[in-house]
Amino acid sequence: MAKLLQPPPKFLPSEWHIANKNQYHRADAQRSRSERLVAESQRLVDEIEKTTRKSQSDVNKKLEQRLEEVQFWKKELDDKLEQLVNVTDDLLIYKIRLEKALETLKEPLHITETCLAYREKRIGIDLVHDTVEHELIKEAEIIQGIMALLTRTLEEASEQIRMNRSAKYNLEKDLKDKFVALTIDDICFSLNNNSPNIRYSENAVRIEPNSVSLEDWLDFSSTNVEKADKQRNNSLMLKALVDRILSQTANDLRKQCDVVDTAFKNGLKDTKDARDKLADHLAKVMEEIASQEKNITALEKAILDQEGPAKVAHTRLETRTHRPNVELCRDVAQYRLMKEVQEITHNVARLKETLAQAQAELKGLHRRQLALQEEIQVKENTIYIDEVLCMQMRKSIPLRDGEDHGVWAGGLRPDAVC
């Protein structure tokens, strides 16, 4: 216990001075290190603050550039969308024009086919494959060809409208995404260090697995623009094609209509001329019938007129047979009476032969009269079919519209049918 209570060892003055100096040196060294650290820390703080400001400024510029780039593509898409919508609206109008043109063609085709059916009711020799029938068949073929062409063009227009709507959908979807992207980037661009809604986000520094590269992004929008341009150009070409088709087909059909009408007029003229000539011949035959009937009457009278002289001659001859004895002489009178009877008999035979010929000729004239009357009826039937039924009906074919230089009732232009 006494050992534990021993006083601490005493140091020498030199040791005391050395210990103090050591403390001074360590304090100076510690302070120097601290001062250097403070200075280094300040430089680090300044450097990082400067770097952060520069980085944030650079990010702001990049966001601003991105906003401008997205805005540029959004405007491009907006312009293409507007153009595509306008040309699609035009195509819808053209589609209606094609539909109306097809509907309008039904009447001319019906009229042409009806004319052909009517003309099948011609009779006799008039049931001929003439120029009118040839041109009517050609007109029907032209109309059917035009309808087939318009139907194909209508299908092309419908398909083009579908393609336009598909491109429009892609543009609208791209525009919608870009609008959202612009909104998001605009919010990001407006953020600053004093914004109230800034916060730390867990795992913010990451690449989304479904993200695309800038090149892919540019290709996507560029492809949408190119597709829209392609469909717009296709639509413009289709519009020009429809205009040409409607113009050319209407012009072709109008020309054929004129050809058919001219054929009808020429055919009617020929038929009427033939009818008039037949009527002239009928009139002459009727005159000849009347003349022949008078001739027959005269011949019959002449034959009847021979009965008196014949009876007289016969009576004289028979009476002279009663002369007595030698008076029953073959004298000159007897021979002359016999010759008279022979002459009368011969003349009556000649008259009867001529009468038979006249009666046969009269029958022939009556047969010719009936044939001419029947043929005139054939011509009248043809004239009625062509002039009354066909040509009157053809007047209802849609005509040229003077104000629009040939607009069809159904919208076909620039030339109408007839």
UniProtKB/Swiss-Prot annotation:
Domain of life: Eukaryota
Entry comment describing in which tissues the protein is expressed: Predominantly expressed in testis. Expressed in airway epithelial cells.
BP terms from Gene Ontology: cilium assembly; cilium movement involved in cell motility; flagellated sperm motility
Protein name in the entry: Tektin-1
Keyword Coiled coil: yes
Keyword Nucleotide-binding: no
Compartments where found: Cytoplasm, Cytoskeleton, Cilium axoneme; Cytoplasm, Cytoskeleton, Flagellum axoneme
Protein purpose: Microtubule inner protein (MIP) part of the dynein-decorated doublet microtubules (DMTs) in cilia and flagellar axoneme. Forms filamentous polymers in the walls of ciliary and flagellar microtubules.
Family from the record: Belongs to the tektin family.
One Gene Ontology cellular component annotation held by this UniProt entry: nucleus
Keywords on record: Cell projection, Cilium, Coiled coil, Cytoplasm, Cytoskeleton, Flagellum, Microtubule, Ubl conjugation
Any one Pfam family match given in the protein's UniProt record, by short name: Tektin
Family annotation (InterPro entries): Tektin-like, Tektins
Subunit structure and binding partners: Microtubule inner protein component of sperm flagellar doublet microtubules.
Post-translational changes noted in the entry: Ubiquitinated, leading to its degradation. Deubiquitinated by USP16, promoting its stability.
Parts forming coiled coils: 21-107, 134-177, 266-308, 333-384
